[in-house]
Amino acid sequence: MATAASNPYLPGNSLLAAGSIVHSDAAGAGGGGGGGGGGGGGAGGGGGGMQPGSAAVTSGAYRGDPSSVKMVQSDFMQGAMAASNGGHMLSHAHQWVTALPHAAAAAAAAAAAAVEASSPWSGSAVGMAGSPQQPPRPPPPPPQGPDVKGGVGREDLHAGTALHHRGPPHLGPPPPPPHQGHPGGWGAAAAAAAAAAAAAAAAHLPSMAGGQQPPPQSLLYSQPGGFTVNGMLSAPPGPGGGGGGAGGGAQSLVHPGLVRGDTPELAEHHHHHHHHAHPHPPHPHHAQGPPHHGGGGAGPGLNSHDPHSDEDTPTSDDLEQFAKQFKQRRIKLGFTQADVGLALGTLYGNVFSQTTICRFEALQLSFKNMCKLKPLLNKWLEEADSSTGSPTSIDKIAAQGRKRKKRTSIEVSVKGALESHFLKCPKPSAQEITNLADSLQLEKEVVRVWFCNRRQKEKRMTPPGIQQQTPDDVYSQVGTVSADTPPPHHGLQTSVQ
C-alpha cells in the first residue's frame, strides 16, 4: 500500500477513488480498499476515528468506473504540495470533519454498503475532508432517533462549505436546486432506510449533504471550468441516469442548504424529490425564492400586471386637434393668451402664464403637461361659450386683463397716400400727422403708429454698415453731385445688389 500511496497516478489507487489528495496510512487505506462489500468496514473506520492524514472512507462509484477517474495534473500537484507541507487543500476549515460521524458506529456500519453503492458522496465527502492536523477523537455517543440532520454535524458542514467555496460569492438567498436525475440510485438508499431505521439515520446526513447536487460539484468547494471533486476528477456519468444529472447540476456549485440553514420543511422538500428518477426542467417558482410546499412559489410575475387606467389619457392626435380648436375659439372670442392664463388662475386656482398657453397651442409642451392642461382649457372654453352674450365672471376677468384690440386694416388707396408722404417726410411732426389723419379720415394714433412701423421696416431692409439715407437726403444731394461722386441712387442700387 505504500507503493500505491507513493504513486498517485495508479488508476486503482483508493486515493483517486476517494477524491483525496492526502496520502493515507496503513489503517485508513486498509479500511478503504476493501471493494464494494468491504466499503462498510471503511465507513465504520471513518466513523470510529479520524486518523491524521487518512482518507477514511472511499467511494466505490469512482473506483468502479476507471474511465471517470481522470487526473488534472496541475490541481494534483497543488494538492501534493499541500500534503507535503503537512497541510490539506481544504486549509483551515476542517474542524467539522470529526463531527460528521454523528450517527452510531453500528448504524453506520450497517448502512455503509447501501450508502456507498447509492451515493458517491457518502465516502468522498468524508475522505476529502480528512486533515493531517486534526487529532483523532473518540466517536460520540449514538443519538436518539433520526435527529442526525439537525446536529452539530450540519452546522459544521455549513461552516466548512462556506469557507471552502472558491466560486463567486452568492449575493442574497441562493436559488434552490432544480429537479434532475439523482446519480447513485437513491432508491437503493431508500430501501435500505426502510429496512433498518438506524441505517436510514446514518445515511440521511450524506443524502442531505449531497442533496439535489449531482457528482460534478464538490460539497466542500467548487472549481470553475468543470473541475469536480477537489478539482481532480472529471464528472462521472450517473449510473442508470446517463449524464443528465451531471449536465443539469452546473447551475449551483454549492448546495443551497449548506449556505443557509435548512428548515425541516426544506428537508422534507429534498426527500420528496428523491423519488424522481428522470431529469425534470427547473420549475419557474424555484428561481424566485426558497421552495415552499402547497404551491407557495408564486412570484411577482403574477401580480406585476396592473391594469392601466389610461382611459382618460388623450393621445397625441387628440391633443393636436384640441390645441388647434382652442386657438381658433380663443381668437374668435377675442381673448388673449394672457387672458386665458389669468382666467385659469382665478377660476380654478392654477395660474398659467401667457408663455405656457402659447406653448400649448404650439404643441411645445411635454406630453404630460399637455395632458394636465387640456382639461382646464376645455373647462375654460365651456365657460366662455356659455357666457357669450351675457356678462359673467369670465367676462369680468377678461375685462380686468388686457383685452386684445382689433387689428386695424388700412385700405389700399389710403396706404398709397401714406407711402407717398413717407417718401417725402419719413418722420413727420405732430401737426403733420394730425393734418394727414384728418385728410385720410383716420385716427391720429393710427397714422402715428403706421409711420413708426414704416421706419422700422425701412431699417430692416437696409443692410448693416451702410449709412441709411432718407428720401429727403437723396433729393437734397441731387444738385451737389460732382464728377467723382456717383449718384446716390446708384450707390443704393449697388448696395442692394
UniProtKB/Swiss-Prot annotation:
* An example Gene Ontology biological process: negative regulation of transcription by RNA polymerase II
List, as start-end ranges, the regions of compositional bias called Pro residues.
133-145, 170-180
GO function term, MF aspect, one = DNA binding
Q: Where is this region: Disordered?
A: 31-62, 121-189, 230-316, 458-497
Q: In which tissues is it expressed?
A: Brain.
Which locations, inside or outside the cell, does it occupy?
Answer: Nucleus
Q: Where is the POU-specific domain?
A: 311-385
Residue stretches in coiled coil: none
Lineage, top-rank taxon, reads Eukaryota
Entry annotated with the keyword Nucleus:
yes
InterPro entries associated with the record:
HD, Homeobox_CS, Homeodomain-like_sf, Lambda_DNA-bd_dom_sf, POU, POU_dom, POU_domain_TF, TF_POU_3
List the GO cellular component terms.
Answer: nucleus
Classification via Pfam families: Homeodomain, Pou
Kindly report the protein's main subcellular placement as a broad class.
nucleus
Regions of compositional bias (Gly residues) in chain numbering: 31-51, 240-250
UniProt DNA-binding residue ranges: 403-462
Q: Which intervals carry biased composition (Basic residues)? A: 269-286
Q: Where is the composition biased (Polar residues)?
A: 465-483
Going by the UniProt record, its keywords in alphabetical order are:
Developmental protein, DNA-binding, Homeobox, Neurogenesis, Nucleus, Transcription, Transcription regulation
Q: How does it assemble?
A: Homodimer.
Function text: Transcription factor that acts synergistically with SOX11 and SOX4. Plays a role in neuronal development. Is implicated in an enhancer activity at the embryonic met-mesencephalic junction; the enhancer element contains the octamer motif (5'-ATTTGCAT-3').
The family assignment reads: Belongs to the POU transcription factor family. Class-3 subfamily.
Q: Know the name of this protein?
A: POU domain, class 3, transcription factor 3
The organism is: Rattus norvegicus
Q: What is the lineage of its organism?
A: Eukaryota, Metazoa, Chordata, Craniata, Vertebrata
